[in-house]
Amino acid sequence: MANEKVQNNRRPMGGPGRGPGGRFMMPNEKPKNVKKVVSRLLKYIGAFKVLFIILIIVVILSTLATLESNIAIKDLVESLGSYDIINHSWVIKDGVTQLPSKTLFYNSLLLLVGCYVLQVICQYFTTLIGAYLAIKTTRKMRNDLFAKLVKLPISYTDTHAHGDLMSRMTNDVDNISNTVSSTLGSLVSGVLTIIGCLAIMIWYSPLLTLVSMVSLVLTLLVTAFMSKFMRPLFQKQQSLLGNLNTQTEEMVTGIKTVAAYNHQEIAKDEFNHFSDTYCKVGLKAQIISGSMGPVMNFIGNLGYFLVCFFGAIFAIKGIGTTLQGEVIGAGIIAMFLKTSKQFTRPINEIAQLYSQILTALTGAERVFEILDEKTEDFTGEIKVDSSKLHGDIDFEHVAFGYVKDKPVLKDFTVDVYSGHKIALVGATGSGKTTIVNLLMRFYDIDSGKISIDGIDISKISKKDLRDNIAIVLQDAVLFEDTIENNVKYGKENATDEEFKRAIEMANCAKFIRRLPEQEKTMLTEGGANLSQGQRQLLTIARAVLADPKILILDEATSSVDTRTEKKIQDAMVKLMTNRTSIIIAHRLSTIQDADLIVVLDQGVVVEMGNHQELLAKKGVYNRLYQTQFSGLDT
């Protein structure tokens, strides 16, 4: 199918496995809508309200313990008394000598230890709940993404790199999971800590609070400045990772072709090109994000120094008081040092985690791009009763192009009668596979009409339509499952008797019985542990079990040996009996008994008739026949 579309330049995005714009072109970058992405992520997290509420409660307890420990430090310092080293006497405050207090000391110490223990416990549960919430959230997201992928139109997967789609399903969702797990609790805790610390600092010293704001302002300015450089780099990095996955997928699935044509070095060079580009972009991103930590630490230490310096000046000169009118002393300065450090710590942590958060948001945006795609419409106006369906197919002046103004099929008009066998013949790119795509409604026609039993297929639900059509592809598609389940893919509720009858009709019962596990034999990916002929026989058995009214055979015997082809032909003869059959084949020996042969050339019907009639015309079909059977040049 791919060849036809490529030959006709019908893949607007470069075709599967190439990525948008072709193999070596960089995808266009879009500006990120951070607010929208964060809002949608929060909706996913909000689906697990109980867990999220528990996390919030635990974080609040941890934050309160942290803030209370700061006040405990103030009381602990003040419990040692206040001694005037200049006058060599204890300070008298409000008529009370500030002597050491054992009671206040032990009470403060006990409270401090209790706060630290509670912090440790809360941090453990914060990590645990955060991880569990991340797993639950991303599981739902991954399930939604997969459910969306299987409902997208075939045109979407035809025009998007499969490796990039896989990257969104795996890498991007994993990045979201890791970020939610490691940063969600930190973000909530950080917000509460900032609010709590700010309230305490203002209460005990508005002047020192203003001094602490210097580091906050610097942190915000640096983060905003560096994010302008980091955001496009991380977006490009994610796109390049999708290209790497696409390249790897192509090489793994096509490794035999690579080896057969001694293409290993070229393949390696192509991969190195992608890998080097990814590394260069990744290195730039990591250099910038890596500098965030040292810069934030410097700003934090600067703020620490400013609090020490101005706090000492205020205390010595008696400048500034608390909101209660209390003069700043050693206890308040000690508390302020710790509180101001905690005040800037969440901001520094968020700044250092910025690259991870940005990667997750980029991945989330890529995931949401797929989730926002329009799904295939399976509804229909007319309900089809399979038991009453005959299988008459009418193509009336059908025209279609994968790209606007570039038709692949032009004025295609053919009548296929119930139970008849029609063969489509033509060079690669002539439109044969497109006809199948249109009949299955993988794509919708641009003009004209396709009818089954006089009913316009555009009015039939796609489910009803496809339930009555079975397709046997040249490249047999099997899944990593048992033989039995692969055959029953055509009818999941089939009985054992129906299954056995299907494999007998498809001539695959004998080789199945020779296998150690017989029908319970587990197939490897793509059925690689079976021969090509055995795989095709299983797909025929699947079609037999589906018991369709209409059958499509897409070059189903063009890549097997003569003996296997005979088995497949016998199975197909049984399968096609009393069914409307459409065959796509380049090997004219398989279609000589067809009721109607349609010869296509560049999307136009050039000849129609049975085998003998077309030979007598001495036209295109005759030349194809002579080429295959007489060795004559066209």
Model-predicted regions and their roles:
Residues 34-49, 165:
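A short amphipathic helical element positioned immediately N-terminal to and/or at the very start
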Residues 47-64, 112, 185-236, 309-321, ...:
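Transmembrane helices of ABC transporter permease
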Residues 24-29, 135, 143-167, 171-173, ...:
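Short intracellular "coupling" helices and adjacent cytoplasmic loop segments at the cytosolic face
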Residues 379-380, 386-634:
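ABC-type nucleotide-binding domain
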Residues 200-214, 284, 288-365, 370:
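Helix-loop-helix
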Residues 46, 122, 126, 134, ...:
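Hydrophobic alpha-helical transmembrane segments of ABC transporter permease domains
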Residues 47, 154-155, 173-180, 184, ...:
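An intracellular "coupling" helix at the cytosolic face of ABC transporter transmembrane type-1 domains
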Residues 52-122, 202-207, 318-324, 330:
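Transmembrane helix-loop-helix hairpins at lipid-water interfaces of multipass membrane proteins
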